[in-house]
C-alpha cells in the first residue's frame, strides 16, 4: 500500500528529474568527460546557453603553484523534453547531467 501511494505521489509531482552520465550523443558523434570544450562544440554545435559560473583555485603540488580554473556550464536541448547540462573546468568536460522538466 505504501509503495502505491508513493508512486501515485511521484506520478503527480512536477519535480525536475535528473541523472548524470559520462557520455553524450550529438548526432552520430559522442562526447565524453575529459573532452575539450572546442571538441564538444565541433561535435554538438552551439549550446542554447553558455555561462561562466566562476573560477576555482587549484594547487599543483608537483610544480608548487596554484592557478585559477574557469568553470563554465553549457546547456543543450530540449531533445524530447530533456536538457543536457555540461560542466567544464579549465576547458575540459567534467560532468554531463540530463534533466527532464514536466
Task: State each model region's role.
Residues 1-5:
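Bacterial N-terminal signal peptides that target proteins for export
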Residues 6-10:
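Hydrophobic helical h-region of N-terminal Sec-dependent signal peptides
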Residues 13-15:
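N-terminal signal peptide c-region/cleavage motif recognized by signal peptidases
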Residues 17-102:
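Residues within mature, well-folded domains
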